[in-house]
Amino acid sequence: MNKRLRHSKMKIAICGKMCSGKSTLANTLKIIDDRYTIYSLGQAVKDIGTNLFGMKEKDRDLLIQIGTKMREIDPDVWTKYLMEKTKYETHCIIDDMRYQNEYDILKENGFVFIQLHVSRHIQEQRLKKLYPKDFQRHLEKREHLSEKNEYVWSEGKEPVITIDNAESANIVIHRLHSFLQKNENDQMSIPLI
């Protein structure tokens, strides 16, 4: 009798433009399966903004400058930092993949990818609701490199799910349930040696 895997594992990275629903999706995945821990590549940037620059509210200009300056020193600084934090995790979600080099490193570390698409109209509505006082500053950053949501996907390492903001929440949740269950079933069918 073959022993079977007792515990599945999956590391997920979510990509999409600002206000496409990345954090909402990560939180939904965690509700569906509470084994997941959510990480953000941008959290260390936000921590620097808050702790060293006194940022009280999200200052996208400052965050972009911090992220860019640190990437000038090492383009992979943020991804390496998170790879170290997540190396022993079996169930984790990175909710903010934005750059090709991040994809390349995450791919090599066994992550699967979910890509979100948001229309400009919906994005603008969400930005206005989320940042009513300074939404215009966020709108001006829509063309920044971090907002392209375009990748050169390696064969076999394309997104496992692509979600358009036009899909209803119920359909998205059903798709996520199905995907997680399929992964669980696939891993349970692999015999241990």
Q: Predicted segment positions?
A:
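P-loop (Walker A) phosphate-binding loop of NTP-binding proteins
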Residues: 17
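Conserved lysine of the Walker
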Residues: 22
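Hydrophobic positions on the alpha1 helix immediately C-terminal to the Walker A/P-loop
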Residues: 25
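Active-site signature of alpha/beta-hydrolase-fold catalytic machinery across serine-
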Residues: 28
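ATP-dependent NMP and nucleoside kinases share a basic, alpha-helical "lid"
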Residues: 32, 37, 83-131
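ATP-dependent small-molecule kinase phosphotransfer cores
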Residues: 37-92, 98-104
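Small-molecule kinase domains that catalyze NTP-dependent phosphoryl transfer to phosphate-bearing small molecules
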Residues: 77, 82, 107, 116-193
